[in-house]
Amino acid sequence: MKFSSAFKFGATFVVACLFSLNSASANSYEQIKKDGVIRIATEGVYSPFSFHNEKDELMGYDVDIARAVAKKLGVKPKFIEASWDAMLAAFDAGKADVVFNQVSITDERKKKYDYSVPYMLSYSAIVVHKDNNDIKSFADLKGKRSVHSVNSMWIPTVEKYGAKLVVADSLSDQINLIITKRVDDTIDDAVMFYDYIKQHPNAPIKIIEAGDEPMYTAAIVKKGNKELLNKINNALNKLSKEGVLSEISLKYFGKDISK
């Protein structure tokens, strides 16, 4: 269900106010060890990263990594689920100790949060029909029909390279338009396409990794919570060396996107 911006703001404001009435600080590592629990904020509705399966079990790339980190820390994970805005409001209010939910690393967020070492690396990518040999990079998009949702973050890229915008809400709808050759392409984070191809291995499409700048995803903790950050970083580094992150990545994407 889609909400208007005004409703979304109002709902988020109410949630933030409710959290502020009973605000608490994010736990220190010592308190987490004492309690035996680390509180992890995540959305729970963002497949394949954080979602519920047919048995209503919480799973996903970020969720599995969070569980593996908790195990390395010797504590149990307690997941705090909420929509993106409400999730961050809960985290800001001290209701969670860490966020594992596809938080991309940006300079703006670095002012407010401390990031862990990255656990996902991806690039922007273009998807076209497997028979399309005209598009090999962003420079080839001029005059092409590029399909995106109405609020897509990729619309400025479409405009920059002179493509013609076609609107379709879901990724499946967008790719169906490509398969039927009613549009030429769509643009997104490459991992979204890896997931689609894993679910639809016979789809007549191909991925063109066109971005030069890597996009990193990491966990966030409260600014200054250095001991917890160091423990999470140590856990992630060990999981990487042991091949656990690669295994989780292959499970969800059929490709290693952990490094």
What name fits each language-model region?
Residues 36-42, 138-151:
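Short loop->beta-strand "edge-of-pocket" segments that line small-molecule binding or catalytic clefts
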Residues 89, 103-111, 157-160, 184-213:
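A ligand-binding cleft/hinge motif common to bilobed small-molecule-binding domains
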Residues 63, 79-89, 133, 151-152, ...:
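Short helix-initiation/N-cap motifs at beta->coil->alpha
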Residues 113-125, 141-142, 159, 170, ...:
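Short Pro/Gly-enriched coil loops immediately N-terminal to beta-strands
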Residues 29, 129-145:
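Flexible hinge/capping segments at coil-to-helix
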Residues 26-102:
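Extracytoplasmic small-molecule ligand-binding "clamshell" domains
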Residues 121-128, 194-237, 253-259:
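Periplasmic-binding protein-like
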